[in-house]
Amino acid sequence: MKIKSLFILLFLSVFTFAHAQLTDYSIFDKKFNFYVANDLGRNGYYDQKPIAELMGTMGEEIGPEFVLATGDVHHFDGVRSVNDPLWMTNYELIYSHPELMIDWFPVLGNHEYRGN
């Protein structure tokens, strides 16, 4: 009996979800683009500069609103504060394309905690 009840509940859940799906896609006419990347802070090593240039070139086409840097934004010993010189050498001098002069939102990973 439990299996039958579970099956009916599952069927009703799927049916309700399938019926409630979006059908008017015009709300997606306005595009919203952004970058999500991680392991960016390599102080110029590991092809960081060519990748940054490619991000800028792609940005000319897609027009990203912001960059979400998801962890490990400062290898190898983290940063001490928002005024740490690594922000300049890891980001400002590397990601210098005009299309990358947008908001950056770094998410701290395990490498950031070493310096602070």
Annotated model-derived regions:
Residues 5-14:
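Sec-dependent N-terminal signal peptides
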Residues 23:
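Membrane/wall-proximal cationic-aromatic binding patches
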Residues 18-20:
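Boundary at the C-terminal end of the N-terminal hydrophobic targeting segment
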Residues 27-51, 56-116:
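Active-site neighborhood of divalent metal-dependent phosphoester/pyrophosphate hydrolases
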Residues 1-2:
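N-terminal secretory signal peptides that target proteins for export/translocation
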